[in-house]
Amino acid sequence: MSGLRNTSEAVAVLASLGLGMVLLMFVATTPPAVEATQSGIYIDNGKDQTIMHRVLSEDDKLDVSYEILEFLGIAERPTHLSSHQLSLRKSAPKFLLDVYHRITAEEGLSDQDEDDDYERGHRSRRSADLEEDEGEQQKNFITDLDKRAIDESDIIMTFLNKRHHNVDELRHEHGRRLWFDVSNVPNDNYLVMAELRIYQNANEGKWLTANREFTITVYAIGTGTLGQHTMEPLSSVNTTGDYVGWLELNVTEGLHEWLVKSKDNHGIYIGAHAVNRPDREVKLDDIGLIHRKVDDEFQPFMIGFFRGPELIKATAHSSHHRSKRSASHPRKRKKSVSPNNVPLLEPMESTRSCQMQTLYIDFKDLGWHDWIIAPEGYGAFYCSGECNFPLNAHMNATNHAIVQTLVHLLEPKKVPKPCCAPTRLGALPVLYHLNDENVNLKKYRNMIVKSCGCH
C-alpha cells in the first residue's frame, strides 16, 4: 500500500472524528512500539522502520493549535496559570485527576448497578465500602455513585468554595455557609448530578467514638418575600464521631436552580445534629468537619456532572472557522519546496492486511503543558490495510464482509472489497485548566480506535 494511500486513510479517520485535515500535520503514524519524539509526519519505509517524513513548521503548529482549541470548545488558551504541582494540591483538582486515572484505567469496563437515588435524589451516603486509594485521608474520594455519574456524563466540573460579597455568615459561625461560582457552566449543558464534598477528621473533633452518631444536612439558602433568608433541605448523610474521610451529599436540585436563575445563588448552609437530639444543632468543629480555612487538599468542593452538546463539531463548520481565521490572521507561506515539505513518497511496501496503526497527536509540543494537565498527547490509532480473500480471524470480519469478499472475486468490477474500519472505539478524557480556580474534565466518546476489522 502506498504512503499516499496510508495518509489518505488517516485523513478519512480524522475527518470522521471531526478533527479536520489540518490535524494530520501533527500526527505520527508509527507502530505501537515506536514513540515519536518530534512533531511531524512519520511513514513506514517498507522495512518495518518508521522514518520522519516532514517536520512541522511554526505556521503548521499555529494551525494545529486553532484546531485543538475548537475541538476542546475553548475560545482561546488559558494564560497566567499556576503550575500543576501547586494547583493539584487543592481538593477539587485532585478529585478530577483521580477520575481521569480511573477513566483511563477502566474505560469500557464500568457496568454500574442501578441506584434508586441517582438523579436528583434527596438521600446521600458515605459509601464506606470504597477502597482507600490514598490512605485514610482520601477515603471515599471516588464513590460508586460517582462512577455511575462519570459513565453518564461527558463533562465533569468542580467548584471550590469562594467568598461572595453578597454572602454573609448565618448564625455567626464560620464554615457553615459555602458559596460556589457556577457562572462558567455553559447554558447548553444538561445537569446529570451534583454533589457536595466535605471532609471529616475525627482527630480534630470532640467526640472520637463510634457510639456517637450525627446527621449532616445541607440546605439551599434562598430569599423569602420579606427579604429574609430561607433554607430548603437538599440532602442528608449520617456519620459517626470517629469517622475520617470525605462525606458526599446530593445537591443536584440546588445547582439546577442556580443555573436557571443565577441571582438565586445565595450558597448553601451546612447543619449538624446528634441523631438522638435532632432539635439541637452541634458545632461542625466538634465532629471534625473541615471548613474553608483548612489546608487546600481538604477544602469543601462541589462536583457537577453534565451531558454536553455534540463536542466534536462538523468538519464543514471547522473549515468555515479556519477560513475566517485565515482572513483575519494572514500568513505568508513559502512556495518553494524544502526538504521538510515534500510530496509524499511513492509506495515502498507490499500490500498489508487490515490492521490497527498508531496515530499520535502531541499536546506538549505546542507548549501547552502549563494548562493541559493530562494526557500529554492523544493516541488515536487508525485502521489501515486491505480486506482480501481469505479473511483471516485477526481481521474481525463480519459475515457480510465474508460474503462480499466472495462476490467481489466473482464480479470485481461491480462489487468492491470490504473496507478496513474500526470495530470498537474508546473515549478520550482530557483534564485541563480553565483558570487558576477551575479545572475541567471532558470525556470525548468514540475518539480512540480499540480494534479494526473488515466491514
From Swiss-Prot:
Acidic residues: which segments have biased composition? 108-118
Q: Name one GO cellular component term.
A: synapse
Lineage start: Eukaryota, Metazoa, Ecdysozoa, Arthropoda, Hexapoda
Secretion signal: which residues? Answer: 1-36
Where in the cell does this protein reside?
Answer: Secreted
What protein family does this chain belong to? Belongs to the TGF-beta family.
Q: In Gene Ontology terms, what is a biological process of this protein?
A: larval fat body development
What is its biological role?
Required for the growth of imaginal tissues and for patterning of the adult wing.
* Chain intervals with Basic residues compositional bias: 318-336
Q: What is this protein called?
A: Protein 60A
Propeptide, residue positions: 37-335
**Where, by tissue, is this protein expressed?**
Expressed in cells of the developing foregut and hindgut during germ band retraction and later embryonic stages. Expressed in the wing disk, mainly in the posterior compartment in the pteropleural and medial regions extending into the progenitors of the scutellum. High levels are found within the posterior and anterior compartments of the wing pouch and low levels in the hinge region. In the eye/antennal disk, expression is highest anterior to the morphogenetic furrow and in the medial regions with lower levels of expression posterior to the morphogenetic furrow.
Q: Which InterPro entries match?
A: Cystine-knot_cytokine (IPR029034), TGF-b_C (IPR001839), TGF-b_propeptide (IPR001111), TGF-beta-rel (IPR015615), TGFb_CS (IPR017948)
Q: List glycan-bearing residues.
A: 238, 250, 396
Q: Where is this region: Disordered?
A: 108-138, 316-345
Which Gene3D superfamilies does the UniProt entry name for this protein?
A: 2.60.120.970, Cystine-knot cytokines
- What is reported when this gene is inactivated? Flies exhibit transparent larvae, and a reduction of the adult wing size.
Q: How does it assemble?
A: Homodimer; disulfide-linked. Interacts with nord and dpp.
